[in-house]
Amino acid sequence: MSDHSEAIATFQSITGASKEESTFYLESHDWDLEKAAQTFTTLQEEENQRNDQPQIEEDYEDEEEEDDHRDPMPASRPVYSKPVAKTVSKKAPAGGRVGGIRTLSDFNNDDHDDHDHSDGDDDEDDRSQQYFTGGEKSGLVVESAPKKGKNGGSGDIVNDVFDSAKRHGAVASNEKKVEKPDSFDSVGYQLGATDQGNRNVSKPKEKDPNSQVVEVKVTFWNQGFTIDDGPLRKYDNPENKELLDDIQRGIVPRELQKKATTPNGLSVTLINNHNQDYVEPAKPKYVAFSGGGQTLGSSSTSTNNNNNNNNNNNNRATTTSTTTTSTPNVSSINVDQSQPTTTVQIRLANGSRLSTTFNHSHTLQDVINYINSSSGSNQSFDLLTGFPQKPVTNPTSTTLKDAGLLNALLIQKLK
């Protein structure tokens, strides 16, 4: 023992243990000072942790009671039992959280915990909240109405559907902005008496149809629910049970999955309006077409169609800002019916359209005089042919036949 007195003294100075304890640990480790000190420190830390725990399993307490009734060991060598692994019952994390992974249910339970510590529970019930749930390519958006308390009827059914959807992982979500489609999606030409002449209207950039997400809206009413603008469907109808059960489980119903026509999947919005009665939207009334029409082209028409053309001009709308609702009072042209005739259509600068009959021998000056008389203006102008537009450069004394303007369309362009 005298040979190990220095090791015992060193162990006591390091650990603060008694001489008997120091001797026991050193002998247990073949007088290896480092290993003995490490074992002593580890056991002391575990012992302190056990003392700090408020609850210990009953089987461990029973062992301690049994140890009290056992005969003590000889005082010459104290016995230090191996520490029992501490077993403390802990409350399982809500939502099945495993290995530090937070699931959708964990977020949902966190919401409930926050509400338990808040003073405004009644205010929370009066707010309209929006939730979403679902997978990578599809999901549900749940927009709940203010709760009015369960009083039976459809309110209980709808509340059960929404509460169940939230329990299956619904979390708060912002409302999506629905992009409105462009009203024009083609290529065209703007025709008319404009300073730019004919103008090409380019086609806007096309949107990739595969990048769009198909959206379906399910609205819950007092009497039942509707899908988009479809008819009212009753809650107690057995045909609707599968759809409601899928929503309660937090998944997109199979019936709605058929609407997913793009790779980006389906977005289903649930709106809780069970406090409101469903009102069927008014059906649009059918209105028969009552406007006028015009045959395009330069085909020859007889003089008997002049009255019909004038009536059509009264009902025809144009794109210019100076549209007129009726044809001006035109001056008559002396037409020799025994001579060849032609019909010339004239589009005035103010948007009005004229259609009159000339002889082949009438000159361009006759046409100019007719336009001035019809428009009531002597402002100088140029005459352009139809499409493609180009100015008429012939002398005013040239006949319509020689100028190649038989059955032509002329456009007035002010200078």
Curated annotation (Swiss-Prot):
Q: Which portions of the chain have biased composition (kind: Basic and acidic residues)?
A: 109-118, 174-183
The UniProt entry, under Gene3D superfamilies, shows: DNA helicase RuvA subunit, C-terminal domain, Phosphatidylinositol 3-kinase Catalytic Subunit, Chain A, domain 1, SEP domain
Where in the cell does this protein reside?
Answer: Nucleus; Golgi apparatus, Golgi stack; Cytoplasm, Cytoskeleton, Microtubule organizing center, Centrosome
Grouped into one coarse class, the protein's main location is nucleus
**What CDD domains does the record point to?**
UBA_CF106, UBX_UBXN2
List this protein's GO terms for biological process.
autophagosome assembly; Golgi organization; membrane fusion; nuclear membrane reassembly; proteasome-mediated ubiquitin-dependent protein catabolic process
Feature: compositional bias, Acidic residues: 55-68
Q: SEP domain: from which residue to which, for each copy?
A: 213-279
InterPro entries associated with the record: C6orf106_UBA-like, NSFL1C_SEP_dom_sf, SEP_domain, UBA-like_sf, Ubiquitin-like_domsf, UBX_dom
For this protein, the record's SUPFAM superfamilies field holds: NSFL1 (p97 ATPase) cofactor p47, SEP domain, UBA-like, Ubiquitin-like
- GO-annotated cellular components: centrosome; cytosol; Golgi stack; nucleus
UniProt keywords (A-Z) are: Cytoplasm, Cytoskeleton, Golgi apparatus, Lipid-binding, Nucleus
Start and end residues of each UBX domain: 337-413
Record region (Disordered) = 1-21, 39-210, 290-338
What family does the database annotate? Belongs to the NSFL1C family.
What is the annotated role of this protein in its UniProt record?
A: Reduces the ATPase activity of VCP. Necessary for the fragmentation of Golgi stacks during mitosis and for VCP-mediated reassembly of Golgi stacks after mitosis. May play a role in VCP-mediated formation of transitional endoplasmic reticulum (tER). Reduces the ATPase activity of VCP. Necessary for the fragmentation of Golgi stacks during mitosis and for VCP-mediated reassembly of Golgi stacks after mitosis. May play a role in VCP-mediated formation of transitional endoplasmic reticulum (tER). Regulates the centrosomal levels of kinase aurK/Aurora during mitotic progression by promoting aurK removal from centrosomes in prophase. Also, regulates spindle orientation during mitosis.
Q: Per its record, how is this protein called by name?
A: NSFL1 cofactor p47 homolog
Q: Which organism is it from?
A: Dictyostelium discoideum (Social amoeba)
